[in-house]
Amino acid sequence: MIRYKILLLSFLLSIISACSSVPKNTADGCSIFSEKYFWYKHSKKAEKKWGTPIYLQLAIIKMESDFDWLAKPQRQKIFKVIPYKRPSSSFGYSQAVKGTWKQYKEDTGNKFASRASYKDSVDFIGWYTNKTKSILKIPLTDAFRQYLAYHEGWGGYKNYKNNQKVILLAKKVENNSNKYKKQLEDCISSLSTKRYILF
């Protein structure tokens, strides 16, 4: 019985590890989805639901967390040595803050959504970018301006020109978005084929 429980625990831990581990090559969209096939299914569903291209979803997650499900902002330090509080409540793949995540759950009815879930994170990104399209009239294909709104918020977007650091980040997202788009063109047909695999 004890041995059975140990084997069961090991199996469950292996499942959790496989589901949550960071992909080996986060710079390649085909590699990501080859390793994490169900991520492709989740991203495809979010694209169909919200209209947000898969390559933009990946580019935002790449910038925000580099696909680390437990990512958090680094703690501030007092006198550059003593660890202090974190600058925001950002967490998970999308680095959504608590307030915006709460709004997402209320708007979508996805009340059990978790910021540590890839499925919920890409749905959140789809929801957010779709609202950005409605509020700020920014096309879902405009990765540069979509990320500016994602980072600065709908209210803070108008002041982005005063923040060169954010502009540079948005350019990186735009470049990554273009790279992911080109990469996925080479493997989208194989990804769209049904697969009956666990991960």
Predicted region positions:
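C-terminal motif of bacterial Sec signal peptides marking the signal peptidase cleavage site
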Residues: 17-18
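Sec-dependent N-terminal signal peptides
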Residues: 6-14
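Positively charged n-region of N-terminal signal peptides that target proteins for export
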Residues: 1-5
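Catalytic glycan-binding domains that act on GlcNAc-containing polysaccharides
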Residues: 21-192, 198
